Swiss-Prot record:
The gene is nkd. This is Protein naked cuticle. Residues 84-101, 307-317, 353-368, 650-663 have a biased composition (Basic residues). Residues 68-80, 120-133, 484-493, 812-822 have a biased composition (Polar residues). Residues 802-811 have a biased composition (Basic and acidic residues).
Length: 928
């Protein structure tokens, strides 16, 4: 089985790491993922992925990653050897440590204890059914509480170690990719999803799969299908996940075990978490740390369950606040029940039921606290102050958003002060990681503001998505575990505010806004600054997510860019060395090239001109962009661009049609595309303005998270805004322009009408209609007349001698260039030119076109812009075909500028926003 293979592989590769007996106790997938993850919990670019949702969902699994991020090098080195044992055993130790939180430090300290606890946790995990081994040994509540404490401790130590390893590993990132085929049974399971993941061997652990890697996988699955998959409230849904790991030469096929969800809150959350990937759920089990379903499952169970729960919650969260709230109520029940078992742990249980999810989220956060908690974690309340704080934070998250908000600064201070040295280093990393996660939570819970945002930031580093669902849950459950949440509140405050602050109210927004905070996390370095920026950006991101593109589109984009994103995704959420800005240009260039081609053929009038232009006839029409471009050049596209700029070069240039004819081919490649982009100066400006409201841009949650995390708040506001809107709009533009030429033209007319203040709407409408009609007629007439003339000339030339041929050749050039200089068409063109000139003389039309495109761009209607631009270009082309190369050259220059700026920024924006926010931010920042 995969578990055996993984065991063998882990035993072989993880020689330096403690092997945990939990492997035998846990399911194969759990062993595989858990061991591997624990083995190299710190390694994986997916950690950033994990930080987005999986970490949020699976704090423990991603805790190592977060720990890598948050744990200071000292802690990392100290926890280095422990991390495996702590990471797994901490999960398990929470199972054993539940009897006494004093066991937590011991368990954390002793790998053997951790292994035992890991087994206990595994038994508790059985509670999920999938993890029956762990589940059975420990009582549910006990496990939950212990899982919370142990999780915190192990995450703290393991996290430090992981972060340390990851910190070192980041320097020598080795990418390994595997594909994950996910299919959901029932509901939207008919969608087979295939993801390609890159595992980053940041630790240098032989590229072992880590929790973070698993988390990244699960998170990706979640991002793709998790939100679309709806699990019956207390029902279950099975997601089949097949993991094939090719880079290692080992392929893991993990048919996800159907995840039956137990009745009740645990069921529902566990089912969702399980739902994600049962195979991944096994992986996520270490990640989620048991899950709410596990309730009291030991840390491993908590890790798996919480991770599942996280996934379940994020899904519910995305699915609806109500459902998430239902889960919350269930968690509250479990939390209330768990606190009965152990109030400190009980709060952990709350955190476990509801907070426990947060424990996962805060686990790594708490692990930081936990390393001190391990140091002084004899009792969960005082010794486990870090753990308690963690649990309390979870409880606060679950139960006391207010307390979290109140305690957030205190918690942060406490969290930073208690392990002051480690914590600060950890805080630096955790600020980055947690801020990313917090950003996710904020994105999901925009409610998390000021102090809540601060509080959330640290805990968010662990489980942003999970925290997000738990946020409103915690808001709903604030009364539960208030005593401990207060002490834990300081820690929980950072993790909790995202949960608590988010509140159920924003849950629906979280579906859209859930990641809006990600731009918020743009300043991951300082919580306070980030809190302020995130608060500001959170508002923007809320808007951004409100205008978010279709999630399916984003998912497809994410899938396409998954590999690149994987490269981009680092544990720290910082752009890694492996994150190459070059990818941004490449990603952008492809869309740009496609969009250029589309744009070339996109505009109705240029295409019309191209089709009718003898130059187009001369040039293969099959090459629609070149043909359209050459044809349009004959009718300079540059003038439209200039016209868009408000410069009416066309009217002046119409007298130079013959010159333009010669340059048709030089300009062809640029003109149409630039013609469409010609308006793009305004479009670009509009897009930039629209992009300036970068948060309003449509960012997939994951991309938003990356964007927010990697790109500073300023960075997100800077380059990404301009680029993303352009990109997002670019592809649609050609489509609509091609499909809706008339509509685009009408939109052009409408935009002109709307811009009547600058120009009479009637004249402009008539102008547009006349232009289009005349252009089409003239072009057709041109073509016919040119053909006739050519035919006549050819016949005449054939009848005549070489002199006739000479005259024929003389005539042919104009005929061939008749699009610009056709005699009859020239007259018509002159009319159009005059008509256009008369209209253009009203300079407003071109500004109108420009402003209209800008409006359209702001509304993500680049299509309209392109249509308008195409029409404007067509108009300008009618003139421009008659206009000299001056217009063309100027147009080309303008268009080139526009091309680089608008097309790159548009594509840049599209790719940047939806695919590689951080990559593109780097590039765009450089570009910008």
């Amino acid at each position: 089985m995969a578990g055996n293979i993984v065991k063998w592989w882990k035993h072989k590769i993880l020689g330096g790491y403690k092997q945990f007996s939990v492997q035998e106790c846990t399911t194969d997938s759990e062993e595989l993922m858990y061991h591997q993850v624990r083995a190299s919990s710190s390694c994986s670019a997916p950690p950033d992925l994990l930080l987005v949702s999986e970490r949020d969902n699976n704090i423990q699994l991603r805790s190592p990653v977060v720990n890598i991020i948050t744990t200071p090098p000292g802690n990392a080195s100290g926890a280095g050897s422990k991390q495996q044992s702590h990471h797994q055993t901490n999960h398990h130790s929470s199972g054993r440590s539940h009897p006494g939180h004093t066991a937590h430090p011991q368990d954390v300290s002793s790998g053997g204890s951790h292994s035992k606890h890991l087994r206990i946790s595994s038994t508790s995990n059985g509670k999920h059914g999938k993890y029956s081994n762990m589940q059975q040994q420990l009582p549910q509540d006990e496990d939950v509480v212990d899982a919370a404490a142990t999780m915190q401790q192990q995450q703290h130590t393991g996290h430090a170690h992981s972060r340390h390893l990851h910190h070192h590993k980041e320097e020598r990132i080795r990418l390994e990719e595997f594909t994950c085929d996910v299919s959901v049974e029932g509901g939207k399971s008919s969608q087979p999803l295939q993801f390609s993941f890159t595992f980053y061997d940041l630790d240098g652990h032989h590229g072992k799969i880590t929790k973070d890697d698993i988390v990244g996988i699960v998170y990706t699955i979640y991002e793709s299908i998790g939100k679309s998959v709806v699990v019956p409230h207390c029902g279950s849904k099975t997601i089949n996940v097949r993991l094939t790991v090719s880079p290692e030469g080992k392929s893991k096929s993990q048919p996800v075990v159907p995840v039956p969800v137990a009745a009740g809150f645990s069921s529902s959350h566990a089912s969702k978490l399980k739902k994600l990937p049962t195979g991944l759920a096994a992986m996520s089990k270490p990640l989620a740390g048991g899950g709410v379903g596990s309730g009291g499952a030991s840390a491993l169970t908590t890790s798996a369950g919480n991770r599942r729960q996280h996934r379940y919650r994020p899904r519910k969260l995305i699915k609806s606040d109500d459902e998430d709230d239902d889960s919350n109520s269930e968690k509250e029940k479990d939390a209330a029940h768990a606190p009965a078992a152990d109030q400190p742990s009980g709060s952990g249980t709350k955190a476990t039921g509801k907070s426990h999810h947060h424990q996962s989220q805060s686990a790594r956060y708490h692990q930081k606290n936990n390393s001190r908690a391990e140091q002084c974690c004899t009792e969960q309340n005082t010794p486990d102050n870090g753990h308690n704080t963690y649990e309390n934070m979870l409880n606060l998250k679950c139960c006391k958003p207010e307390v979290d908000q109140v305690d957030c600064p205190s918690h942060r201070q406490h969290h930073q002060s208690h392990p002051n040295h480690q914590m600060r280093q950890q805080d630096i990393y955790m600020k980055q990681a947690t801020q990313r996660v917090k950003m996710l939570r904020r994105a999901r819970k925009q409610k998390y503001q000021d102090h809540c945002l601060e509080t959330r930031q640290r805990s968010l580093s662990v489980g942003n998505d999970s925290a997000c669902p738990n946020r409103h849950l915690q808001l709903q459950q604030p009364p539960v575990g208030h005593p401990q949440p207060q002490s834990l509140n300081h820690k929980s405050a950072s993790g909790s505010p995202p949960l608590g602050v988010g509140g159920g109210g924003d849950m629906m927004l979280d579906g859209v806004q859930l990641r809006q905070p990600r731009p918020h996390s743009l300043t991951p370095h300082q919580h306070q600054q980030q809190n302020q920026q995130q608060q500001q950006q959170q508002r923007k991101s809320a808007e951004c997510w409100k205008s978010a593109l279709n999630r399916n589109d984003l998912i497809s984009i994410i899938r396409e860019s998954m590999e690149k994103n994987r490269l981009c995704f680092q544990l720290n959420g910082k752009p890694q060395a492996n994150v190459s800005p070059i990818r941004q240009p490449a990603a952008q260039q492809q869309p740009q090239q496609q969009q250029r081609q589309r744009c070339n053929t996109g505009s109705k009038i240029p295409t019309l001109i191209t089709n009718h232009s003898p130059v187009a006839q001369q040039s293969p029409l099959s090459c629609s962009p070149p043909t359209a471009e050459p044809t349009t050049p004959s009718i300079p596209a540059a003038p439209p661009a200039i016209e868009v700029n408000g410069q009416q070069h066309h009217p002046t240039h119409p007298t130079h049609p013959s010159h333009h004819n010669h340059h048709e081919h030089p300009q062809p490649h640029i003109p149409i595309y630039h013609q469409q982009l010609a308006i793009n100066p305004a479009v670009l400006a509009a897009q930039q303005t629209h992009n300036t409201a970068h948060n309003k841009l449509n960012l997939c949650g994951y991309d938003s998270f990356l964007h927010a995390t990697i790109c500073g708040g300023g960075a997100a506001a800077h380059s990404p805004p301009a680029t993303p809107s352009n990109v997002a709009t670019v592809q649609p533009i050609p489509k609509k322009s091609q499909k809706n030429l008339l509509q685009g033209y009408q939109r052009l007319e409408q935009s002109q009408q709307q811009q009547q203040q600058q120009r009479s709407s009637k004249d402009y409408k008539n102008y547009g209609n006349l232009i289009y009609a005349k252009l089409s007629e003239q072009l057709q007439q041109k073509d016919r007349e040119q053909r006739r003339q050519r035919h006549k000339q050819q016949q005449h030339q054939m009848l005549q001698d070489q002199p006739k041929d000479a005259s024929r050749s003389e005539q042919r050039p104009p005929t061939s260039n008749s699009s610009s200089a056709g005699s009859k068409i020239y007259g018509d063109a002159v009319e159009c030119a005059h008509l256009l000139a008369s209209e253009e003389e009203d300079l407003p039309p071109s500004p109108q076109l420009t402003s209209t495109p800008s409006k359209v761009v702001s509304t993500d209607t680049l299509i309209d812009l392109n249509d308008d631009v195409g029409e404007a270009v067509a108009e300008a082309v009618t003139e421009g075909g008659k206009q000299s190369l001056e217009a063309e050259e100027s147009g080309q220059q303008v268009e080139v500028e526009l091309d680089t700026s608008a097309s790159s920024s548009m594509i840049h924006r599209y790719v940047h926003e939806h695919i590689h926010h951080h990559y593109h931010h780097f590039k765009e920042q450089q570009d910008v």
